Amino acid sequence: MEDYVIIVNRIEDLQLTQDRSELELIFERAKRTIVGGQDVILVRQNRNGQEEKFQTISNEQDFEEYRKQVFRFL
């Protein structure tokens, strides 16, 4: 299994549209990655399409904190 990349811009868009089901799918995949021993990498995409990595989540506790933070705004 490979590391799972979450593009934070996409998460923010889904928060704005309150697309809970799509967010759940993303976070289910991410959790399976963590449980499988790989990392979840948070990146931000700039206007040129370049991705800038700004955080790596490697354990379930940190992942759950990030998940709560995202869903708190829905």
Regions found by a protein language model. Name each.
Residues 1, 17-20, 49-51, 74:
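Extended interaction regions within the primary functional domain
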Residues 1-13:
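Short aromatic-glycine-(Arg/Gly/Cys) micro-motifs in beta-strand/loop hairpins
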Residues 11-24:
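A short, exposed loop/beta-hairpin motif centered on an aromatic-Gly-Thr core
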Residues 21-41:
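A short, charged, amphipathic alpha-helix used as a generic interaction element across diverse proteins
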Residues 35-74:
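Short, mixed-charge low-complexity intrinsically disordered segments
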